[in-house]
Amino acid sequence: MRIAFVISEHAGGLLPERMGQYHAVERRLAHLARAEVTTVHYSELGAVGADATVLSGSADPWSAHDPTALDDLFGSLRARNEPVLGICAGMQLLARAGGGEVRTASRPAGPGFVNVDALDRSDLLAGLERRVSVWEHHTDEVLPLPMGFRALATSEHCAVEALAADDRRWWGTQFHPEEWNGDHPAGRLILENFLRLAGIPLR
């Protein structure tokens, strides 16, 4: 089985220090999943087949991205059938691909662990407490919730902390579940839940 890990940074932002962060996410996925993890830039997604796709975050604002390249990505996402998880900017990409909007957050969050309240624990957030601590760092947010999506989590500084589009098997988190540790384990369970939803066996 294969997981496509998609780097959502624009081409000019693929700096060595950022690539190190993305490779760390790749290693976390490989640590959890009995599957090959293939890392690609979002401009290459259309040429890669996968059983599940994970969209990374992005350090730079959307204005730094080529609008045509983003439109091509949205088309590729809509044409694919496998489950997709969007992380931070990756969630924003899913919302935009689904007809939603992204705007500057009124209260930028992080960097650091913050409390998030689960609204729907039926799939991606299954097994979590109602309030969990997750790592967050973002200046934009999805608002309003796009039509056909449901909100899974919220917080005092971000109305849509996690979402799902059931008809497409898309899930997203505004926070970074890959940033877990012994004191803040929720992110690991969220990634494991996504892998189960995608039919990817766990190690």
Model segments located where?
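Alpha-helical elements of Rossmann-like donor-binding domains used by nucleotide-donor carbohydrate transfer enzymes
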Residues: 24-25, 72, 150, 189-193
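Short, charged N-terminal beta->alpha structural module
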Residues: 5-32
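Pocket-forming structural segment of enzyme catalytic cores
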Residues: 96-166, 170-171, 175-185
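Glycine/Thr-rich phosphate-binding loops of Rossmann-like dinucleotide-binding domains
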Residues: 13-14, 62-64, 95, 181
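Cofactor-binding loop segments of dinucleotide-utilizing enzymes, especially the Rossmann-like FAD-
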Residues: 8, 42, 89, 175
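Glycine-rich nucleophile elbow surrounding the catalytic serine of serine-hydrolase chemistry
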Residues: 87-95
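Acyltransferase
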Residues: 175-203
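Flexible gly/pro-rich beta->alpha loop and the following alpha-helix that scaffold active-site loops
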Residues: 27-86, 98
